[in-house]
Amino acid sequence: MGLHTLLLLLLLRISASAAASRPPLDTLGIPPQDEAYFRGGVIRCRDGSGRFARDKLNDDFCDCPDGTDEPGTSACPEGKFYCQNAGHSPITIFSSRVNDGICDCCDGSDEYDSNVTCKNTCWEAGKAARDKLKKKVATYKSGVVIRNQEIQKAKVAFAKDEAELAKLKGEEKILQGLVDKLTEQKKLIEKAEEEERLRKEKEEKRMKEEAEKQAADEKKASDASQEVDSQENHETVQEDESKVAEHHDGHATSHDNHTPESESSVEQHDPESQDDISIKAAPADESPPEETSAAPTKEQESTPADSEGLSREELGRLVASRWTGEKVDEVSKDDKNEHEAEHDMPEHSEETHEDESDVPESAEDSYAGYHSEVEDDRHKYDDEDFSHESDDEYVDDHDEHVASYKSDDDQKGDDHSDFTASGQASWLDKIQQTVQNVLRTFNFFKTPVDLSEASRVRKEYDDASSKLSKIQSRISTLTDKLKHDFGKEKEFYYFYDQCFESKEGKYVYKVCPFKKASQVEGHSTTSLGRWDKFEESYRVMQFSNGDRCWNGPDRSLKVRLRCGLNNELNGVDEPSRCEYVAVLSTPALCDEQKLKELEQKLEASSNQRDHDEL
């Protein structure tokens, strides 16, 4: 009897406990924040499709298509059931899982009318969740401190980069002006050098043409001289033969006494002695017109002896000199000797007149006055006053230019000493001063161009252009950097120059925020995309337009950010073909607002536990 009574009391207590843990039927499955919506006598379906009376709430019959009237039963497939899970985290499940024989809620409230008895495990699960929540709160607290420090650094760095960019733009403007001036001067130098080059080419061409023309004239004169000499030799031979014949007829009785003279005459007219004949004829035309009538004969007599050792080539040059006006030292000496011999041998005057009459008039006319014209041309530029005057002008101009250049260098040295003394002059001021000195020094109207000064202008142009190029490159880098969105408080600013890596199997994944993401296998690199944007309020980084998959889309990567004390990339996966995901822990996500929410959640969980224990 006593045992029976104890069992009955135990069953009644268990039933009472189960009834106490189960909420009332009319509020079953309704979230606490929605209870006010169901307090009226007539309740409207949330989708606006109809209305229902309060007594039809959770009557296991679906009146609203969206399941508004059946949150605690499985009558409506679109209904939602709220698990309170006291001591742990509440969750929401589909109403179709209510009373299906599977315990979905840790407090067992979803199986209130089934054959399954669900054990309440919320305390055990809640304790583990609270411990995890406590760790998360601690991480957030430390992360918030790090984040605030990084934000302060980022703001200072951002302001510094903005100031540098503004300064560089100002320097670029000044330096661009200097480069433009130097470019203009450089073009003038190149133009002057080109004009000088063309002038030299033209002068060289003219001199070459004159040389060719002179050579042609000399050849023509040589050919004509040879032709005249040949004609004169022919006439001389005929005259000599005629005289020999007359002389032979007049002295036929004295043949034996004149045999040596005849042999000598024959030898003189032998074909092998034609060179001697041409030598004899040449000096007759070479003597000046002002000489006495006896001079040609003396020259004819002396020429064979003086020119006996000359070759045909030398004789040709001797004859050609009469055409070109050039003097031959040996011929001049022979002429002098002939003039001296002329006064010592007057007895040959008659013979001289006879030989002079034999010279063709055409030859004398063709050479008459030519020597005097050549001499006039030869002494046309022998004006000593003109030579000295031009030399003085050049020296004065050169000295004046050198003095000007030296004064600029001295002033440059003085300026440099001033900069050293003050210590306040920047590199840009020095460049400006140097360029001004160069532009003042260089004389663009001087011909030919001063190579040292031109080289100096080019050097300053190269230096200024190189500096300008570096400044423009830095401006481009800063402009590209500062155009990005670094978060509400610039919390992601220090991400710009960083890359994060994670090894997953045989691959190494590399993520560089604001730039690119890649997958590396050995020496092969596959692009997972270039920087696109932030998503979900700076909680996701999106990389798009990577390498195309074979017969598929372009690769892409989404990096989900979460609070962490260090920047660590992990959890890289490919849930869909060529669509990658990863997780990046960073202090940048440890914001104070989220920390407050977690602290409130932890406090609420602790208060609920204390209340339930009571």
UniProtKB/Swiss-Prot annotation:
<feature type="signal peptide">
    <location>
        <begin position="1"/>
        <end position="20"/>
    </location>
</feature>
<dbReference type="InterPro" id="IPR036607">
    <property type="entry name" value="PRKCSH"/>
</dbReference>
<feature type="disulfide bond">
    <location>
        <begin position="549"/>
        <end position="578"/>
    </location>
</feature>
<keyword id="KW-0325">Glycoprotein</keyword>
<keyword id="KW-0256">Endoplasmic reticulum</keyword>
<dbReference type="GO" id="GO:0006491">
    <property type="term" value="P:N-glycan processing"/>
</dbReference>
<dbReference type="Pfam" id="PF13015">
    <property type="entry name" value="PRKCSH_1"/>
</dbReference>
<protein>
    <recommendedName>
        <fullName>Glucosidase 2 subunit beta</fullName>
    </recommendedName>
</protein>
<feature type="compositionally biased region" description="Acidic residues">
    <location>
        <begin position="352"/>
        <end position="364"/>
    </location>
</feature>
<dbReference type="InterPro" id="IPR009011">
    <property type="entry name" value="Man6P_isomerase_rcpt-bd_dom_sf"/>
</dbReference>
<dbReference type="InterPro" id="IPR039794">
    <property type="entry name" value="Gtb1-like"/>
</dbReference>
<dbReference type="GO" id="GO:0042742">
    <property type="term" value="P:defense response to bacterium"/>
</dbReference>
<feature type="compositionally biased region" description="Basic and acidic residues">
    <location>
        <begin position="372"/>
        <end position="382"/>
    </location>
</feature>
<comment type="pathway">
    <text>Glycan metabolism; N-glycan metabolism.</text>
</comment>
<feature type="region of interest" description="Disordered">
    <location>
        <begin position="194"/>
        <end position="396"/>
    </location>
</feature>
<comment type="subunit">
    <text>Heterodimer of a catalytic alpha subunit and a beta subunit.</text>
</comment>
<feature type="glycosylation site" description="N-linked (GlcNAc...) asparagine">
    <location>
        <position position="115"/>
    </location>
</feature>
<feature type="disulfide bond">
    <location>
        <begin position="563"/>
        <end position="590"/>
    </location>
</feature>
<dbReference type="InterPro" id="IPR028146">
    <property type="entry name" value="PRKCSH_N"/>
</dbReference>
<keyword id="KW-0611">Plant defense</keyword>
<feature type="compositionally biased region" description="Basic and acidic residues">
    <location>
        <begin position="194"/>
        <end position="222"/>
    </location>
</feature>
<comment type="function">
    <text>Regulatory subunit of glucosidase II. May be required for defense response elicited by pathogen-associated molecular patterns (PAMPs).</text>
</comment>
<feature type="disulfide bond">
    <location>
        <begin position="499"/>
        <end position="512"/>
    </location>
</feature>
<feature type="compositionally biased region" description="Basic and acidic residues">
    <location>
        <begin position="324"/>
        <end position="351"/>
    </location>
</feature>
<feature type="compositionally biased region" description="Basic and acidic residues">
    <location>
        <begin position="231"/>
        <end position="272"/>
    </location>
</feature>
<keyword id="KW-0732">Signal</keyword>
<feature type="compositionally biased region" description="Acidic residues">
    <location>
        <begin position="383"/>
        <end position="396"/>
    </location>
</feature>
<keyword id="KW-1015">Disulfide bond</keyword>
<dbReference type="Pfam" id="PF12999">
    <property type="entry name" value="PRKCSH-like"/>
</dbReference>
<dbReference type="GO" id="GO:0017177">
    <property type="term" value="C:glucosidase II complex"/>
</dbReference>
<feature type="domain" description="MRH">
    <location>
        <begin position="497"/>
        <end position="592"/>
    </location>
</feature>
<dbReference type="InterPro" id="IPR044865">
    <property type="entry name" value="MRH_dom"/>
</dbReference>
